Amino acid sequence: QPLPDQKERKKEFNTEIDIQALLKQLNDLTGMQSVKTEINNMINLLKICKIRQENGLQTPPVTNHMVFLGNPGTGKTTVARILAKIYHGLGVLSKGHLVEVDRSGLVAGYMGQTSEKVTEVIEKAKGGILFIDEAYALANGQQGDFGQEAIDILNKAMEDNRDDLIVIAAGYHDEMQDFLDANPGLRSRFNRTIEFPNYDAAELLEIMTNRAKSLDYTLTDDAVQYVQDTFTRILACPPENFGNARSVRNYLDRVIHNQANRLITENNFKEEDLTKLTLADVQSETLE
């Protein structure tokens, strides 16, 4: 029995996927209110399209490829991973997995290898989302570079596999314009752009305290105040390599190491001290 043509795949709600739980997971993420609104709107459209289809009505064509614009550590990959599962639950994708690549995962150094590499990645991503981080790097190569070849193959694959593949191209705002201009068809393929704002000081603090809590740690009041003041100061003039939530997670990891060293050195601690991150712990580290 031959497999049905991909475009004939019947798209039905996957009742085993708890879409409401996934939406809660999305909406519980710190900050990014505009992102959540945009994605909830997209999902509402897909739900209605599905119901119209079930009632024998015409459904408007929906292109699901997207561009995510924003700095590192603003939640782009996290949102893409949740989105893949939601789209699987809605029947838009047959598997709902996420394949994450950057330029090195698509571009090879010799003639003919790039085509093989891109095709292999596309095959692996079918049924899910292909997330291309720093996609603009594909368009930034020198003459004779194979980045353009990767873009051209990708452009065709997005159209050929649009029934069961979503491509999300992610990166900084300005550089991504070069990527979208690298092939005449790209802008029409990526007809939805979502901007991920940087976190403010209160949101970074929430990310840190939530992560600490998930690891059975709490920050003392003076540690919380110190961290909030530090975030406020850093954001007033952020260093070039500041990674938003990524920097906060790395900072917390180092603070936890400080606490371990402090407790072992003091050698006189109670069980409750194992969960406390103090002012001394957070002051010993710089946020990078």
What are these language model-derived features?
Residues 90-95, 175-181, 187-188, 196-241, ...:
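Conserved C-terminal "switch" segment of AAA+ ATPases
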Residues 136-168, 174, 181-185:
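Conserved catalytic/switch belt of AAA+ P-loop NTPases
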Residues 96-125:
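Short glycine-rich substrate-engagement loop in P-loop NTPases that contacts/grips substrate
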Residues 11, 18, 28, 219, ...:
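C-terminal helical "lid" subdomain and adjoining coupling/linker elements of P-loop NTPases
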